[in-house]
Amino acid sequence: SETAQSSGVGFAVPVDLVKRVVPSLIENGKYIYPLMGISGNEVELTLRENVGLPSDLVGAYVTRVTPDGPADLAGIQGDTGTQFSDLNFDGDVIISINNVQMESMDDLVGYLALNTSPGENITVGIFRNKSEVTVSMTLGFRPPTN
């Protein structure tokens, strides 16, 4: 920029995402992202200690589930706390999608964007009550932002 305020700032977009999104943008003027209908966080030490999770468990901790959304309809459970700062540590941990391990919330979001489409059926591996459970889910679509 002329003021050099953005000097040195760069962004990287994975080429696989570009190959997936650009044709839809050209053809339709938009791209519709898949949606699970959850909010989540990383599996951190505090969560492991409060719930007694295995020390090597990784995944995406489900803090909220959108009512009547894909995850809710599939039976995925979010934390019952009313605020992020008031978690009860009783939500599910998503550990895999379609047998691909999810090590973080970023992994989950990236996997959905690069490998799935709205309306697609996926298999979700979750850790709940000290055991692994698998559920099937049909992905929704993320509403466009204006």
Located regions from the model:
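C-terminal recognition in membrane/secretory proteostasis and scaffolding
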Residues: L17-N146
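Active-site proximal helix/loop that lines the substrate pocket
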Residues: S1-E2, L47
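Serine endopeptidase catalytic core focused on the charge-relay Asp
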Residues: E2-V21, M36
